[in-house]
Amino acid sequence: HNNDGYRVVTEMLDFETAVQVAVDFASGRDDTLVVVVADHETGGLGITSGSAYGTSAEIGWVHTGHTGSPVAVYSCGPNSVLLGSHMYLANIPKIISLGWGVTDFGPERELTGPGAF
């Protein structure tokens, strides 16, 4: 939320390590679903190549708060094929629940929009 490029890089490296632990654990199992998704996008980070060859990349921000950009969904394991690359966040817990045998969400909680089936 602070539009801090250094923190973006260090946090993403730590996040990558954590996700790899989860993926390694789930690898070869049929009872573990790994879902990686953000609750929102913040800042509208943009990366350019700099002004000349050999210069560092430049970063910029288009906003200081949440943006309307969709968030990506990455998943592996049971029912992961039901999770699209982008979808309404409200559908994700419903799809995860399918792995627990929950199929009746009630009429007000049915899957809707992109990613619905």
Please report, for each region that a protein language model flagged, where it lies by residue.
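A post-motif C-terminal structural segment
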Residues: 1-117
